[in-house]
């Protein structure tokens, strides 16, 4: 018997998809289905967690010259 469950469709570019896969690699409870290179079906309760972790990853990878001046 098929099961139906409500999910959230995430559309993103392949680089963001790779980050989401990395976030999910520890627990394997975020991504329900990898649909293609730009679409993921995820647990709707985890969407805000995904956004928080993506913001953290992206802020960590942004070059900020003012931080370099503060920490010589």
From Swiss-Prot:
Cellular component terms (Gene Ontology): cytosol; transcription factor TFIIH core complex; transcription factor TFIIH holo complex
Compartments in which it is found: Nucleus
Biological process (GO) annotations?
nucleotide-excision repair, preincision complex assembly; transcription by RNA polymerase II; transcription initiation at RNA polymerase II promoter
Q: Do you know which Gene3D superfamilies this protein is assigned to?
A: TFB5-like
Q: What Pfam families has UniProt attached to this entry?
A: Tfb5
Q: How does this polypeptide assemble, per the annotation?
A: Component of the 7-subunit TFIIH core complex composed of XPB/SSL2, XPD/RAD3, SSL1, TFB1, TFB2, TFB4 and TFB5, which is active in NER. The core complex associates with the 3-subunit CTD-kinase module TFIIK composed of CCL1, KIN28 and TFB3 to form the 10-subunit holoenzyme (holo-TFIIH) active in transcription.
The entry's family comment says: Belongs to the TFB5 family.
What is its biological role? Component of the general transcription and DNA repair factor IIH (TFIIH) core complex, which is involved in general and transcription-coupled nucleotide excision repair (NER) of damaged DNA and, when complexed to TFIIK, in RNA transcription by RNA polymerase II. In NER, TFIIH acts by opening DNA around the lesion to allow the excision of the damaged oligonucleotide and its replacement by a new DNA fragment. In transcription, TFIIH has an essential role in transcription initiation.
What name appears for this protein in its UniProt entry?
General transcription and DNA repair factor IIH subunit TFB5
